[in-house]
Regions:
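Gram-negative outer-membrane beta-barrel domains
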Residues: 2-243
Length: 243
C-alpha cells in the first residue's frame, strides 16, 4: 500500500513539473501598441519673438508722406487655444496676447515750418484666429487667419528745427486682420514647440495736431497701410483629449 502511495506521489510531481515546463515554453503575448498621437485638446503656452511695424503717415497741410523706417522690436506673451483632429486634418481656434517693446520711427521730412518727425510706441498686440492644417504624426503644419488689435500709447510729433514737440496724440487701439502660417512639433503627448509667422494689417486712422507756437500750424495726419510682421518661437502644453 505504501509503495502505491509513493508511486502516485512521484507521478503527481512529474506531472506538475511537466505542466510547469510547458507553461514556461508558451509565448508571452506582446503588450498592445500605444495609441496614435492626436492633436485634439485644449492647450496653453507662451512665446517670444520679433515684430517689424510698417506703413506711413500723410499730413494734410503739406501733402507729404512720413514713411515708417525698418524698425524691429521684441514681443513676448502667451496663447490659449483648442484643436480638433479628424484623420490627418486639424482645425482649431487660438487667442494670443503679446507685450511689444518697439518704437515706430517715421522719416524726417522737410516742410516750410521746419524738419518734422513723428514717432510712436506700440504697447501690446492681441489676436483671435482660426488654425487649419495637416497633421503628420507628431508634426502639425497650419495656416492661420483672423482678427488683430494693436495698442499704441500715442504719437509724438517733433519739429527738429525748433525742438518743439507735442506728445500723446491719438493714443488708441487699432483693429485689423491677421494672416499667417506655422509648424508645430510634439515632443511628447503633452509638450509641443512651434514656429509661426504672421502679417497683421490695420485700418487707416486720422489724428490731429493742434496749432502750438512755435511748432507748426494745425495739421491732420492719416495713416496708410499700417502693418506689423511678427515671427515667434513658442511652446504649448496640450491637455490631450485624443486618447
Amino acid at each position: 500500500m505504501l509503495k502505491h502511495i509513493r508511486a502516485a506521489g512521484l507521478l503527481s510531481l512529474l506531472l506538475a513539473a511537466s505542466i510547469t515546463a510547458h507553461a514556461a515554453d508558451m509565448p508571452v503575448p506582446a503588450p498592445p501598441p500605444p495609441p496614435p498621437f492626436s492633436w485634439t485638446g485644449i492647450y496653453v503656452g507662451g512665446n517670444v519673438g520679433g515684430a517689424a511695424p510698417g506703413g506711413s503717415l500723410t499730413d494734410s497741410l503739406f501733402g507729404i508722406d512720413f514713411n515708417l523706417g525698418t524698425n524691429t522690436g521684441f514681443i513676448g506673451g502667451g496663447q490659449l487655444g483648442f484643436n480638433y483632429q479628424i484623420g490627418g486634418f486639424v482645425i482649431g481656434v487660438e487667442g494670443n496676447f503679446d507685450w511689444v517693446v518697439t518704437q515706430n520711427l517715421h522719416s524726417q521730412v522737410s516742410t516750410p515750418v521746419g524738419t518734422i518727425q513723428a514717432t510712436s510706441n506700440d504697447t501690446y498686440i492681441t489676436t483671435a484666429a482660426a488654425r487649419v492644417g495637416a497633421a503628420v504624426d507628431h508634426w502639425f503644419l497650419y495656416a492661420k487667419g483672423g482678427g488683430a488689435w494693436v495698442g499704441n500709447n500715442g504719437f509724438t510729433v517733433t519739429n527738429l528745427t525748433t525742438s518743439a514737440s507735442i506728445t500723446g496724440l491719438n493714443s488708441r487701439t487699432n483693429s485689423g486682420w491677421l494672416a499667417g502660417f506655422g509648424v508645430e512639433w510634439a515632443l511628447t503627448r503633452n509638450w509641443t514647440l512651434k514656429f509661426e509667422y504672421d502679417y497683421l494689417g490695420f485700418n487707416n486712422f486720422n489724428f490731429a495736431v493742434p496749432p502750438t507756437a512755435p511748432f507748426i500750424p494745425g495739421d491732420t495726419f492719416t495713416s496708410n497701410n499700417r502693418n506689423i510682421q511678427m515671427a515667434q518661437l513658442g511652446f504649448n502644453f496640450l491637455f490631450n483629449l485624443g486618447y
